Amino acid sequence: MALHDENVVWHSHPVTVQQRELHHCHRGVVLWFTGLSGSGKSTVAGALEEALHKLGVSTYLLDGDNVRHGLCSDLGFSDADRKENIRRVGEVANLMVEAGLVVLTAFISPHRAERQMVRERVGEGRFIEVFVDTPLAICEARDPKGLYKKARAGELRNFTGIDSVYEAPESAEIHLNGEQLVTNLVQQLLDLLRQNDIIRS
């Protein structure tokens, strides 16, 4: 859609975000997990979603690999495609936040500008940047998908951390040590959500 198309207008609906949040008994936010491949983003996000589900929190997890099977299946890994990938995910996450959900996203999202773009789209107070900080050597040793091995062999180009830059967050809402136990990291995230009055259980 062209931004200047005067025939396309925004429709307001009678049920508000606040009413949806009252229905869910918690606030709608996005927790944006970022870090290198193999840092533990998806693992921690999945464990957190499981913990939140047990507490009765309405959640949805958007995973970097999964969205490329559908929503972003037409995109590659050029800088332009990566930016569009994050833009689309940001729009979907924003809709889910407006539905009153706690949205968890697990994406490398290597560039600060793109993460800032999503933050501005979702809005301050509803965007929580989660930096899963795991040393490259540890990520490479884990290499669950064998991607680092391929990148080192020259079989995979533009791989973040090897021949493509990762811009670490400078002021994430929470900075996790990716070498700690997953259970410890989940507890840190639950504590943050409670301290910020996002969940009450």
Swiss-Prot record:
| E.C. designation(s) | 2.7.1.25
Spell out the reaction equation it catalyses: adenosine 5'-phosphosulfate + ATP = 3'-phosphoadenylyl sulfate + ADP + H(+)
**One protein family per Pfam:** APS_kinase
Describe which pathway this protein belongs to, using the record's wording.
Sulfur metabolism; hydrogen sulfide biosynthesis; sulfite from sulfate: step 2/3
Which branch of life, at top level? Bacteria
**Could you state a single Gene Ontology molecular function term?**
ATP binding
Please name the Gene3D superfamilies in this protein's record: P-loop containing nucleotide triphosphate hydrolases
Keyword check for Nucleotide-binding: yes
Against PANTHER family, the record matches this protein to: ADENYLYL-SULFATE KINASE 1, CHLOROPLASTIC, BIFUNCTIONAL 3'-PHOSPHOADENOSINE 5'-PHOSPHOSULFATE SYNTHASE
Q: State its role.
A: Catalyzes the synthesis of activated sulfate.
Report what the protein is called. Answer: Adenylyl-sulfate kinase
